[in-house]
């Protein structure tokens, strides 16, 4: 089962394709991406009932500062998440990671490695593009998703940028 990987693409895209191929091989954790057991994962929620409060800028700045010492993942859970502003337009989003967590619960760690983007030392997932998709996710599903990331990933700190409309 061969898959063509174009060498004229970003390193992230190449790594994502390699990880995806290894995930499909059966047991990716047997080959690579094992994580050491973490003591505790800190989950930091950033929330403001006031719109335009520069909350996202603050959350990103906090994430970058913490990422100097810890492995940090930033998740934007806002209805209008800043694509085109703070974040690029293209790439896999929180919606893709959430879908993957539903389908391949044991392999979320491998999928995340290919989905995350980087802002300096900070890792992040792009926000969902469609507000309806974000609103359709039940609180139990968000909780399970965050727990999966905490249990299966390398991240020691998760920063959740939470919207008041969620």
Where are the regions a protein language model picked out?
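Acidic-aromatic/histidine active-site loop/patch
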Residues: 1-41, 92-95, 99-109
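Structural signal for conserved beta-strand scaffold positions within catalytic alpha/beta enzyme cores
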Residues: 5-6, 48, 74-76, 124-126
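A generic secondary-structure signal
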Residues: 20, 65, 148-149
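Short loop/turn elements that form and flank the Walker-type P-loop nucleotide-binding site
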Residues: 40, 119, 153-154
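Walker A/P-loop NTP-binding active-site region of P-loop NTPases
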Residues: 43-106, 157, 161
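Short acidic, S/G/P-rich loop/turn micro-motifs used as interaction or catalytic elements
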Residues: 51-54, 130-135, 164-166
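P-loop/Walker-type NTP enzyme "switch/lid" segment
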Residues: 77-150
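Conserved catalytic-core segment of NTP-binding enzymes
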Residues: 148-166
């Amino acid at each position: 089962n061969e898959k063509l990987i174009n060498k004229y693409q970003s390193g992230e895209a190449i790594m994502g394709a390699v990880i995806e191929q290894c995930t499909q091989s059966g047991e990716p954790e047997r080959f690579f991406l094992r994580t050491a057991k973490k003591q505790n994962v800190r989950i930091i929620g950033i929330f403001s009932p006031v719109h335009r409060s520069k909350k996202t800028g603050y959350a990103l700045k906090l994430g970058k500062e913490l990422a100097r010492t810890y492995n940090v993942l930033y998740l934007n859970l806002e209805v209008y998440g800043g694509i085109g502003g703070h974040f690029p337009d293209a790439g896999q989003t929180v919606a893709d990671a959430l879908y993957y967590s539903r389908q391949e619960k044991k392999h979320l760690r491998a999928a995340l490695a290919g989905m995350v983007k980087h802002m300096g030392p900070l890792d992040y997932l792009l926000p969902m593009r469609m507000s309806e998709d974000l609103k359709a996710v039940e609180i139990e599903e968000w909780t399970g998703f965050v727990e999966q990331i905490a249990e299966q990933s390398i991240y020691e700190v998760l920063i959740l940028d939470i919207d008041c409309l969620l």
